[in-house]
């Protein structure tokens, strides 16, 4: 059985925290900023954690990632 390869697209989008959780960026941040409020744009700048339901699936794709 061959080794599991790290999904390179996922490895570039997620970072592992010290406690083992996965950190991600918010969506809706590439264009159309005139239609978003200042509060919404400020909140989108911060990073977020991957939810528990998605974590199980993403963990397999980035298993070897540090």
Curated annotation (Swiss-Prot):
Belongs to the bacterial ribosomal protein bL35 family. One of its GO terms (molecular function) is structural constituent of ribosome. GO terms for cellular component: cytosolic large ribosomal subunit. Pfam families: Ribosomal_L35p. The keyword Ribosomal protein applies. NCBIfam families: rpmI_bact. SUPFAM superfamilies: L35p-like (SSF143034). The keyword Transport does not apply. PANTHER family: 54S RIBOSOMAL PROTEIN BL35M (PTHR33343), LARGE RIBOSOMAL SUBUNIT PROTEIN BL35M (PTHR33343:SF1). This is Large ribosomal subunit protein bL35. Residues 1-28 have a biased composition (Basic residues). Residues 1-50 are annotated as: Disordered. Gene3D superfamilies: 4.10.410.60. It comes from Listeria monocytogenes serovar 1/2a (strain ATCC BAA-679 / EGD-e). Keywords: Ribonucleoprotein, Ribosomal protein. GO terms for biological process: translation.
């Amino acid at each position: 059985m061959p080794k599991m390869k790290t999904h390179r697209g996922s490895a570039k989008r997620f970072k592992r925290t010290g406690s083992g959780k996965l950190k991600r960026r918010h969506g809706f941040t590439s264009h159309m900023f005139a239609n978003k409020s200042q509060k919404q744009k400020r909140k989108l700048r911060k990073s977020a954690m991957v939810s528990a339901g998605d974590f199980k699936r993403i963990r397999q794709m980035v298993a070897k990632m540090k």
